[in-house]
């Protein structure tokens, strides 16, 4: 079975074509700057990279170009679009309705639309990708995989906020959590690496990229996660503030005379590492580099960043009454030995012991255990693979309906 995985953003479509027999990526790429001047397609086959400059006014045109490229004589990896057996889509928000991945039908499309106010930047764009695929590949089954679904096992004590209950009843304001597909993939893979059953382990997964979240996975089910009603809660991130006193935005709005929308943009796009560094960078690589060169302010930013992650890990060890493994993933988690070492230095009371050499060697796509043999809690690095998880779900659902 061949599955086309699509991640449709507001001005981009990322894609991978995966041959499920052997789980081999045949090609991948991104159509970027959709609806903006300078749009193009970056297409990769093995180690070859091809760039096609083309005006892409909308998502349908972008997907058309992607599909034409897949069957192109020179750049293509298949001869006919009929070789695509199914399409798997990433959808950011499934609300409370979707606890697992589902086959797309009219009812599902309507439900995704209904929860769009909870993810106004993402869901409408995800929907455009789904509708374009349904139009351009008629008769091919489409499956949606939700970022929020894995967190739907979180109990009420962890997902309800202490605000008037009527707001939950009226507006479904609660903790939803995000990065669910990544947390699900790395917790499953960590159990495989450890040679244990996922259902027997208490795992804390740390998805540390430009956006970042921690999840407590107890016996295969998520019981808490750091992102909340939106991806703004929790850790200090590239441009997002993470946790802060809810009175602060009101105070700033009053003092600076700014609107709620402006305040929201500041917390989402101008805060976090970017805000702390006074606009120097939102990229942790730049902050690390400056800190290593002796920049005291960047050293402090690293401390703030690492401290917050360690605090959440400690909290989740308490929430699960113990922890067997801690997993680092995503851009920073997979590639920053400094972050992993510093975070783990707070966790020695749990019995965490890091193997310095393994920690420094496990970067750039490598996976493995980076704790010492006598470490009570195992620490792992697992490169995330959300696309593969989406493809696996798609295959499973399509096979069930006998397509």
Curated annotation (Swiss-Prot):
Q: Kindly tell me the pathway this chain contributes to.
A: Metabolic intermediate biosynthesis; acetyl-CoA biosynthesis; acetyl-CoA from acetate: step 1/2
Species the sequence originates in: Thermotoga sp. (strain RQ2)
For this protein, what is the EC number?
Answer: 2.7.2.1
Print the organism lineage: Bacteria, Thermotogati, Thermotogota, Thermotogae, Thermotogales
Task: Quote the record's cofactor note.
Answer: Mg(2+). Can also accept Mn(2+).
Name the keywords, alphabetized: ATP-binding, Cytoplasm, Kinase, Magnesium, Metal-binding, Nucleotide-binding, Transferase
Which reaction(s) does its UniProt entry say it catalyses?
acetate + ATP = acetyl phosphate + ADP
Q: Which PROSITE patterns match?
A: ACETATE_KINASE_1, ACETATE_KINASE_2
InterPro entries tied to this protein: Ac/propionate_kinase, Aliphatic_acid_kin_short-chain, Aliphatic_acid_kinase_CS, ATPase_NBD
- Name the Pfam families on file: Acetate_kinase
The broad enzyme category this protein falls into is transferase
Q: How is this protein named in the record? A: Acetate kinase
């Amino acid at each position: 079975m061949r599955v086309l995985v699509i991640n449709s953003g507001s001005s981009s479509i990322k894609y991978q074509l995966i041959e499920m027999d052997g789980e081999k990526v045949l090609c991948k790429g991104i159509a970027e700057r959709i609806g903006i001047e300078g749009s193009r397609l970056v297409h990769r086959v093995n180690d070859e990279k091809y760039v096609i400059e083309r005006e892409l006014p909308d998502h349908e045109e972008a997907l058309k170009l992607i599909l034409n490229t897949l069957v192109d004589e020179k750049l293509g990896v298949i001869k006919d679009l009929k070789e695509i057996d199914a399409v798997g889509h990433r959808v950011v928000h499934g609300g409370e309705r979707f606890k697992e991945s589902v086959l797309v039908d009219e009812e599902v499309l309507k439900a995704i639309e209904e929860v769009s106010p909870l993810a106004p930047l993402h869901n409408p764009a995800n929907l455009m990708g789904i509708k374009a695929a349904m139009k351009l590949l008629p008769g091919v089954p489409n499956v949606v995989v939700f970022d929020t679904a894995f967190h739907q096992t979180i109990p009420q004590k962890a997902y309800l906020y202490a605000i008037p209950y009527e707001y939950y009843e009226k507006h479904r304001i609660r903790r939803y959590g995000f990065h669910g597909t990544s947390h699900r993939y790395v917790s499953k893979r960590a159990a495989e690496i450890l040679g244990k059953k996922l259902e027997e382990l208490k795992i804390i997964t740390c998805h540390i990229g430009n956006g970042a979240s921690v999840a407590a996975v107890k016996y295969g089910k998520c019981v808490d996660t750091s992102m909340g009603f939106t991806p703004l809660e929790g850790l200090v991130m590239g441009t997002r503030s993470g946790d802060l006193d809810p009175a602060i935005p009101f105070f700033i709005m009053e003092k600076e005379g700014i609107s709620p929308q402006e305040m929201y943009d500041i917390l989402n796009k101008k805060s976090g590492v970017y805000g702390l560094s006074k606009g120097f960078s939102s990229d942790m690589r730049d902050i690390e580099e400056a800190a290593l060169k002796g920049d005291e302010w960047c050293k402090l930013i690293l401390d703030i960043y690492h401290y917050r992650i360690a605090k959440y890990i400690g909290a989740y060890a308490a929430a699960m009454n113990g922890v067997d493994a801690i997993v680092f993933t995503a851009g920073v988690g997979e590639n920053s030995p400094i972050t992993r070492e510093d975070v783990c230095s707070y966790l020695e009371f749990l019995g965490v012991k890091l193997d310095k050499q393994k920690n420094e060697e496990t970067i750039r796509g490598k996976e493995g255990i980076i704790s010492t043999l006598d470490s009570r809690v195992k620490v792992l690095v697992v490169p995330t693979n959300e696309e593969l998880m989406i493809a696996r779900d798609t295959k499973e659902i399509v096979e069930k309906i006998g397509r």
